């Protein structure tokens, strides 16, 4: 009887050992499968600091929301300002992960900095300068030539900011010297001047005009057909190049999903030009 009990006990112990080994094996396989699945999905995490041109503010907010929804472990933070101001901040020691300017000239300046050593740039969108007039067109400005004799306030960006560079070139081309100009730091500030009635007209982008109209602002506009479209290049800093989250966001900006979001705000795809 004792012998039988010993055999039974040994059998039970052996069965428990095999069962535990089996469970351990399944757990390991499950963990391995989860890791493989995570790697395959390309999931990333971390914070991504983006310096972006002021004209990207509205579109940029939706881009952030869409990317973070697909990548819940990522947090995108923005600084929106004039492109020249963003480059200046980096020159003075700021260290974002990604820079998006509203022209190639300011990106060229950034490319000379150590923070962008060996950086590759990718144009993610294009935009177009337009002359807008305040509601009711108090300055009676219906063409670019009307600015020659206008006494009204005309808002323009600083000349070292992309929207200011384009406006300055266009005015010089048509031999126009503004009699009553107000100079602003970026295109958003110019738009505000016009929408609040503190300027009779201003040079902004078609994207800013579209946003103002969506907000119920009844601005008039004058097309500037001979002004070239300006490009929006994006480039990772050396800091961003070592971040999987920053690299993935930078690549995603050229995806169909991101391009559809940009198109909603009147940006055009670089492939369309």
What are the roles of these predicted feature ranges?
Residues 87, 93, 97-103, 107-113, ...:
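Short beta-strand-centered segments that line the small-molecule binding cleft or hinge
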Residues 18-22:
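C-terminal motif of bacterial Sec signal peptides marking the signal peptidase cleavage site
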Residues 128-130:
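Early exported N-terminus immediately downstream of N-terminal targeting peptides
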Residues 73, 95-96, 199:
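Short, high-confidence coil segments that cap the C-terminus of an alpha-helix
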Residues 24-65, 69, 84, 88, ...:
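Exported/periplasmic ABC-transporter solute-binding proteins
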Residues 1-11:
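Bacterial N-terminal signal peptides that target proteins for export
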């Amino acid at each position: 009887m004792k012998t039988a009990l010993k055999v039974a006990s040994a059998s039970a112990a052996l069965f428990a050992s095999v069962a535990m080994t089996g469970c351990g094996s399944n757990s390991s396989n499950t963990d391995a499968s989860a890791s493989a699945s995570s790697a395959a999905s390309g999931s990333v995490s971390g914070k991504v600091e983006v310096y972006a041109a002021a004209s990207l503010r509205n579109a940029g907010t939706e881009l952030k929301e869409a990317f973070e929804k697909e990548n819940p472990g990522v947090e995108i933070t923005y600084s929106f300002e004039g492109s020249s101001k963003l480059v200046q901040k980096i020159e003075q020691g700021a260290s974002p992960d990604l820079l998006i300017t509203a022209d190639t000239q300011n990106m060229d300046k950034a490319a000379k900095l150590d923070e962008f050593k060996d950086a590759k740039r990718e144009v993610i969108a294009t935009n177009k300068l337009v002359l807008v007039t305040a509601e009711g067109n108090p300055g009676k400005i219906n063409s670019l030539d009307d600015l020659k004799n206008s006494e009204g306030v005309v808002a323009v960006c600083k000349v070292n900011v992309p929207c200011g560079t384009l406006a300055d070139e266009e005015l010089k081309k048509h031999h126009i010297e503004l009699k009553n100009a107000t100079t602003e730091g970026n295109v958003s500030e110019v738009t505000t001047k016009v929408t609040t009635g503190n300027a009779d007209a201003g040079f902004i982008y078609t994207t800013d005009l579209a946003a103002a109209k969506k907000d119920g602002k009844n601005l008039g506009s004058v097309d500037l057909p001979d002004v070239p479209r300006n490009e929006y290049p994006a480039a990772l800093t050396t800091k961003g190049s070592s971040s999987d989250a920053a690299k993935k966001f930078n690549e995603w900006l050229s995806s169909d999903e991101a391009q559809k979001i940009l198109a909603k705000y009147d940006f055009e795809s670089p492939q369309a030009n």
